Design a protein with these regions (language model features):
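Short boundary/hinge segments that flank catalytic cores
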Residues: 8-124, 130-150, 156, 160-161, ...
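Conserved inter-motif catalytic segment of the P-loop NTP-binding fold
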Residues: 155-181
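Switch II (G3) loop of P-loop NTPases
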Residues: 151, 174-218
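Short, small-residue-biased leader/transition segments that mark boundaries at the very start
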Residues: 1-6
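Residue-level preference for the first positions of well-ordered beta-strands
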Residues: 95-97, 126, 171-173, 205-207
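Cytosolic nucleotide-binding catalytic cores of signal-transduction proteins
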Residues: 123, 145, 215-217, 224
Length: 309
């Protein structure tokens, strides 16, 4: 009887320990303090959550437009972009990989807004959509999906032919292309490196929008061709453990990590609601990203409809 009691007690303690460790693993990043204690990666700034008017369609382009008209967002992005630009110039970097630890952190919109901010500062900027499994850059810029990186990697396009000019005062873009999902293994190959080498002379900054590096190897393979990397961390989304693992993975591939930026920040913390990323009318911006075992795999509660990552 006593041995059974001891076994039951040990089993109960182990269960409590597993629950504790599981809870610790799920603790999400709420502020810079959560990461400063566990990583030496540089904090580059925080972007506020942006609301979309109730009657507006909550699409990637609508959210991007709302950000462009938010003075608080624009000022925060201006500061972040200046820090990034200064660091890249100091190290003579031209190409920067931008990723996130998990799906749904607003990475793609961050890339496009950063590109706009750097362009306003007089830099020649190119955005390349390297997320061939789930391309989203064209959605943020409100453009149809057209020939781009996938076609180039398949050998059916020249470097100059796949660049789309969005107009005066806007960055240029290489969209993912129509043959998405078929050329991902070539992102770490010679063809992609040749493309970047051909484009470096034409641009001051080349931003590579990649899949979340915690769940896809595409980002890490792309990183081998990049000069540096930046991680977008959505407040109260990815766990601290996944963020730390993503930073470590980038470092293990020899990609200098420029730092991280907090995204979609509010003062409300857990249980936040409202418009913008967090979901008016059942929209959950970036949630339900197409990775994982099935559609709807993601890190938010709402999964009815999705936007770009």
């Amino acid at each position: 009887g006593s041995e059974m009691c001891i076994r039951d007690s040990i089993g109960a303690l182990l269960s409590l320990l597993l629950l504790y460790l599981s809870g610790r693993a799920r603790v999400t990043v709420m502020s810079r303090d959560d990461l400063q204690q566990v990583t030496s990666a540089r904090y580059l700034g925080a972007l506020p959550a942006v609301r979309v008017k109730k009657r507006s369609r909550t699409t990637s382009a609508a959210l991007s437009e709302a950000m462009a008209h938010s003075s608080a967002y624009c000022e925060a992005m201006r500061i972040i972009s200046m820090r990034i630009d200064k660091a890249m110039q100091r190290h003579d970097y031209r190409t920067m990989l931008v990723s996130s630890a998990a799906p749904g952190e607003g990475k793609t919109t961050f890339v496009c807004q950063l590109a706009d901010a750097l362009t306003r500062q007089g830099r020649r900027v190119l955005v390349i959509d390297c997320d061939l499994r789930n391309p989203s850059v064209h959605k943020v810029f409100g453009r149809p999906l057209q020939a781009g990186l996938a076609e180039y990697l398949a050998g059916s396009g020249m470097a100059g032919q796949i660049v789309t000019a969005l107009g005066k005062g806007k960055p240029d873009v290489v969209f993912a292309g129509r043959r998405t999902g078929t050329q991902t293994e070539q992102l770490g190959g010679d063809a992609f490196r040749t493309l970047l080498d051909a484009l470096r002379a034409r641009y001051d900054v080349i931003l590579l929008d990649t899949p979340p590096c915690a769940i896809m190897t595409d980002a890490l393979e792309t990183g081998e061709a990049a000069d540096c990397a930046l991680l977008v961390v959505r407040q109260d989304a990815a766990s601290r453990v996944s963020v730390i693992n993503s930073l470590a993975a980038l470092d293990s591939f020899g990609v200098p990590v420029l730092g991280y930026a907090l995204n979609v920040c509010t003062g409300r913390g857990r249980g936040q609601s409202g418009y913008g990323y967090g979901g008016y009318g059942g929209y959950s911006y970036g949630y339900g990203y197409g990775y994982g075992r099935d559609r709807g795999y993601g890190y938010g509660q709402q999964k009815e409809k999705t936007g770009a990552d």
